Curated annotation (Swiss-Prot):
Family named by the database record: Belongs to the IPP transferase family.
Cofactor: Mg(2+)
Molecular function terms from GO: ATP binding; tRNA dimethylallyltransferase activity
Name of the protein described by the UniProt record: tRNA dimethylallyltransferase
Function as written in the Swiss-Prot or TrEMBL entry: Catalyzes the transfer of a dimethylallyl group onto the adenine at position 37 in tRNAs that read codons beginning with uridine, leading to the formation of N6-(dimethylallyl)adenosine (i(6)A).
Native organism: Petrotoga mobilis (strain DSM 10674 / SJ95)
PANTHER family hit by this protein: TRNA DIMETHYLALLYLTRANSFERASE (PTHR11088:SF60)
Top-level division of the source organism's lineage: Bacteria
Length: 303
């Protein structure tokens, strides 16, 4: 079975440095597994590897999607699997790097096993309680073919169909079809990098200041001047939405910096929680291990 190395972990943990060294040692080619670094024009705020870094080993899918595009995990799965196949055909090793757990689940499990969003389910049930029949109408609008196959009173299946569409952005019929056609035989070896909380928070805070020094505000200003709407998913993410508020005069500079730090720390916490649920992942605490030891440990696990 074709082996694929996955280097995952929360934002600012240090995935880039480790993955570069690993890729150099195993004839690896790095493939983006980050839902923000996949967009073009979003460089500083997403901590996308710079051009000098990309020259060290081949990088793929970074900046490959226009921010105006409605890009889903389903779209990512198709792009990433194609790229993985190309790398393997060259006799090299695919190294997936990033912190988007949903992308990893899409590759490993497809979408029939999309994790439940209990917050969303609770919200949908409240909608139905307050307005009986509304979820059926919502499903008809989102996925009319699926709605025809579910009894109007089967609230559980209606909620699940809506949930999958909201999470993935695709219809159930397309998911079933894709899963039937999915014949990839990739063997994913998953490494999750982590650090002690205080150290990770300090790295996040330092990165925020570094991004601002490197021109994050100007990057956002340029995106707006190019006509990119603030309602786009790409611009409604951490680091960008706060700068937009600052540029529009809704918050001052210090509050902008504070919000980016807090929101990034909370995001890192959610990433860690998500990765904790992935069975078979090998966790490595970078706070307790030198980079050289980490690289050797990963190589011994993978090779």
């Amino acid at each position: 079975m074709n082996k694929v190395l996955v280097i995952a972990g929360p934002t600012a943990v240090g995935k880039t440095e480790i993955s570069i060294e690993i890729a150099r040692r195993i004839n690896g080619e790095i493939i983006c597994m980050d839902s923000r670094q996949i967009y073009s024009h979003l460089i500083i705020g997403t901590a996308t590897p710079d051009e000098e870094t990309k020259k060290l080993v081949p990088h793929h899918l970074y900046g490959s999607v226009d921010p105006r595009t409605h890009f889903t995990a389903f779209d990512y799965k198709k792009l990433a699997e194609k790229k993985i196949g190309e790398v393997l055909n060259r006799g090299n090793t695919p190294v997936l790097v990033g912190g988007t757990g949903l992308y990893l689940d899409a590759l490993r499990k497809g979408f029939l096993n999309v994790k439940s969003d209990y917050g969303l389910r609770t919200y949908l049930r409240k909608l139905e309680t307050n307005n009986p029949g509304v979820l059926r109408k919502i499903l008809v609008d989102l996925d009319p073919q699926r709605a025809q196959k579910i009894h109007p009173n089967d609230l559980k299946r209606i909620i699940r169909a809506i949930e999958i569409y909201v999470i993935t952005g695709i219809k159930m019929g397309e998911i079933v079809k894709e899963n039937r056609q999915d014949e990839n035989s990739f063997d994913y070896h998953i490494i999750v990098l982590d650090r002690e909380r205080q150290e990770l928070h300090e790295r996040i805070n330092k990165r925020v200041h570094q991004m601002i020094d490197e021109g994050l505000i100007e990057e956002v200003r340029n995106l707006l001047s190019l006509g990119y709407s603030t309602t786009l998913n790409a611009l409604n993410t951490i680091g960008y939405k706060e700068v937009v508020q600052y540029l529009y005069g809704k918050i001052d500079f210090n509050e902008m910096v504070h919000q980016i730090k807090v929101n990034t720390r909370n995001y890192a916490r959610r990433q860690i929680i998500y990765f904790r649920k992935i069975e078979g992942a090998k966790w490595i605490n970078l706070s307790k291990t030198s980079q050289e030891e980490v690289v050797d440990q990963i190589l011994s696990e993978f090779i």
